[in-house]
Amino acid sequence: MIIMMNCFPCFTSQKSRNAPCTTNETNDDNVEHDEFRPPVVATTKRTEEREPAEQQPPVKTFNFRELATATKNFRQECLLGEGGFGRVYKGTLQSTGQLVAVKQLDKHGLHGNKEFLAEVLSLAKLEHPNLVKLIGYCADGDQRLLVFEYVSGGSLQDHLYEQKPGQKPMDWITRMKIAFGAAQGLDYLHDKVTPAVIYRDLKASNILLDAEFYPKLCDFGLHNLEPGTGDSLFLSSRVMDTYGYSAPEYTRGDDLTVKSDVYSFGVVLLELITGRRAIDTTKPNDEQNLVAWAQPIFKDPKRYPDMADPLLRKNFSERGLNQAVAITSMCLQEEPTARPLISDVMVALSFLSMSTEDGIPATVPMESFRDKSMSIALSRHGSCSVTPFCISRKDVGNKSSSSSDSEDEEEEKEQKAEKEEESTSKKRQEQEETATDSDDESDSNSEKDQEEEQSQLEKARESSSSSSDSGSERRSIDETNATAQSLKISYSNYSSEEEDNEKLSSKSSCKSNEESTFSRYDSGRDHDDSSRNTSMRINSLAHDDKEEDEEENHETRSYSDHDDSPRNTSMRINSLSHDDDEEEEEENHQTRLEHIHSSKSEDQSVYSDDDAGESGESSLHRIEAKEEEHISSDHD
């Protein structure tokens, strides 16, 4: 009879319909297990209203005794690790033989069962290959345990800093694949889940690796399950636990966003590149904080190879290293809005994780990145001489979460940048045109100056040739004195341009004090002529040598000042005419002396012009006059 009654739901009690299917006798009475385990018979209207609960992801419930047996009563030998949320033990389920990781949450400040189960349901919805899968839970009495899949390879921290004897270090491609997988998991939490899940505790110890180094993120979405939420003492200890990974806004007490996770991911990526811990107290004081140590290196691309992990032995593409450092530097920006989206980081790392030696190709389309600043930064890092792309604080605005607003802002920025580039290019073209015009004008002016100089030189040569033709005739003493006077005037004009007023004043005073001398020659004594002519020839030869030295000095002085100036041209012409006139004067003087000796009948006076030792012809007259006077006095 009882069996017959059990076949019909109308004879079953309400309590029996709501009874759970599992044999967990230690659960509290206020837990409604039918949310997870629907009744066997669902023919009533009440069960139809619970159809949404049937669509919940399957989450298995465990009793405490079963999990204690799986972990050997939570022995120390089964302990995998300990964090801010509690301890993690390795266990084996006796029913299936499956290896699991049992996380025993701290008992202090626990939520009620309803809140705990709501969070468990939200965790069960998060399914991704790069996330550790939640298998079940336990809520017996005051016990709160979570059961996850077991990842056999250990954590990224173990492979970077706690290598076993004989274990090979990870190569460059493996490290980039780990970074790419972690970025995929983080991108799922940020963009594929509504509302977005903020990791809050991303670090190397929370990235688990399987036997093939496939990364899986753990401890995600547990911030609401965190015991002691609201307790300032506990929160401060949590900050200390993640010190070195936490974003600057977290330490300032600001609200956390998805960009805070991007900063933590940048620290992990920097650890993969350098092989250094985020905080290492064994290093010198200026190298204990990894981010603070790396910030100056970001500005010097030549030092990028030096910051790479020595265990890599430089077995990586230099271009790929530069691009990885560029991505890291963007993730570690001080301002949250200046950091890239994790989706763009994921796309960039997808190319770096490939088995290529060229890094990210330059032909990656702009549409691959949601934020165009990432593509610009990577294109700038195509060579080894480009510094990391950094967005200034002035350009950083309050970016909205929607992609349409960010795209509009980026388009406006691009248009402004294009306009600025066009304006700068136009200015450069104008400057080049003006420079070419000025060069043409200068060339034409120089050609004109050369033509004028040549014409003046030709005129000077013509005048010198005409004067040489006329100098063949005998000129009187007055004509000779007039020529000497003209030479004195031209030379004084030249010297006035080169010397200062003091020298000119001293020269004029010297000229005023000197007097002209006259000598008379005895026409009756023939034997004196030969001695006098000999001394005069010797003096003329000495004067010629002195005059040549003075001419060379004048030429060097005239050519060293300004070659293209009209003043220099006139100085050259004066020097050339002066040289020609001096040669004519020498010839005329010799003919004049021969005429004096041949006539021997008249006394002639020679006019000497005193120029304070500056004019060669004047000094010659003074020397000759004095010698002739001395000879005449001896004969008398």
UniProtKB/Swiss-Prot annotation:
Primary site of residence: membrane
EC numbers on record: 2.7.11.-
Regions of compositional bias (Acidic residues) in chain numbering: 432-455
Source lineage: Eukaryota, Viridiplantae, Streptophyta, Embryophyta, Tracheophyta
Modification Phosphotyrosine occurs at: Y250
Occurrences of domain Protein kinase (ranges): 74-352
Amino acids binding ATP: L80, G81, E82, G83, G84, F85, G86, R87, V88, K103
GO cellular component, one term: cytoplasm
Tissue expression as described in the entry: Expressed in mature pollen and in germinating pollen tubes.
UniProt keyword annotations, A-Z: ATP-binding, Cell membrane, Coiled coil, Cytoplasm, Kinase, Lipoprotein, Membrane, Nucleotide-binding, Phosphoprotein, Serine/threonine-protein kinase, Transferase
Membrane topology: Lipid-anchor
Region (Disordered): 18-57, 389-636
Compartmental location: Cell membrane; Cytoplasm
Record text on subunit structure and interactions: Interacts with PRK6.
Organism of this sequence: Arabidopsis thaliana (Mouse-ear cress)
Knockout-associated phenotype: No visible phenotype. Lip1 and lip2 double mutants have a reduced male transmission.
Protein name: Receptor-like kinase LIP1
